[in-house]
């Protein structure tokens, strides 16, 4: 015989309110912020309905739980705005890549380093990639010297996150801002 379908109960997001609060007594704060002390839950709900607002559990872990008389819709809206603002302020760290060759000219090197400094100021990580072509693979020490030079030039503003390593025909190093 088949078992009957039993869906998981819907979890409400946000604080408990009105009849969802299942404790005998609460500490009540009214809409003006005045503390009414320890009150029975029925009395608190009656006061909230009288004011045309909702009874919302603010601190559920307290003994007794702290409840406030507020407009639940307005409270949820304010919480959504706060969360959106926090998300907007978060910055995702990107990895910017700077590609070079082992026999790079001095001016080209300076231009690449200026770009790397700009990336560090923006808070991004920088991946320095050296590509070896043809017979350059025989002179990997030149690539290692160049990456050491990059490391020395950025020592005040960046730290090495991954040391230089060779992968195929490319040598890579990742730097992160301090």
From Swiss-Prot:
GO molecular function list: ribosome binding; translation initiation factor activity
Record key words, sorted: Cytoplasm, Initiation factor, Protein biosynthesis
GO biological process, one term: ribosome disassembly
A Pfam family reported for this protein in Swiss-Prot or TrEMBL: IF3_N
Subcellular location: Cytoplasm
Chain spans, region Disordered: 1-20
Claim: Protein biosynthesis is one of the keywords in the record: yes
One term under GO cellular component: membrane
Primary location class: cytoplasm
Family statement: Belongs to the IF-3 family.
Task of the protein: IF-3 binds to the 30S ribosomal subunit and shifts the equilibrium between 70S ribosomes and their 50S and 30S subunits in favor of the free subunits, thus enhancing the availability of 30S subunits on which protein synthesis initiation begins.
Quaternary structure and interacting proteins, as annotated: Monomer.
Name of the protein in its database record: Translation initiation factor IF-3
Organism for this UniProt entry: Brucella anthropi (strain ATCC 49188 / DSM 6882 / CCUG 24695 / JCM 21032 / LMG 3331 / NBRC 15819 / NCTC 12168 / Alc 37) (Ochrobactrum anthropi)
């Amino acid at each position: 015989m088949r078992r009957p379908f039993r869906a998981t109960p819907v979890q409400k997001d946000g604080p408990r309110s009105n009849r969802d609060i299942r404790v005998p007594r609460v500490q009540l704060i009214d809409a003006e912020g005045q503390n009414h002390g320890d009150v029975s839950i029925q009395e608190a709900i009656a006061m909230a309905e009288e004011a045309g607002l909702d009874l919302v559990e603010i601190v559920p872990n307290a003994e007794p739980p702290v409840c406030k008389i507020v407009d639940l819709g307005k409270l949820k809206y304010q919480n959504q705005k706060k969360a959106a603002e926090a998300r907007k302020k978060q910055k995702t760290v990107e990895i910017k890549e700077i590609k070079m060759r082992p026999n790079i000219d001095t001016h080209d090197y300076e231009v690449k380093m200026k770009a790397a400094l700009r990336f560090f100021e923006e808070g991004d990580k920088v991946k320095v990639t050296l590509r070896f072509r043809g017979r350059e693979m025989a002179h990997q020490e030149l690539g290692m010297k160049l990456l050491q030079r990059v490391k020395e030039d950025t020592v005040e503003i960046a730290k090495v996150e991954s040391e230089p390593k060779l992968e195929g025909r490319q040598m890579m190093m990742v730097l992160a801002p301090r």
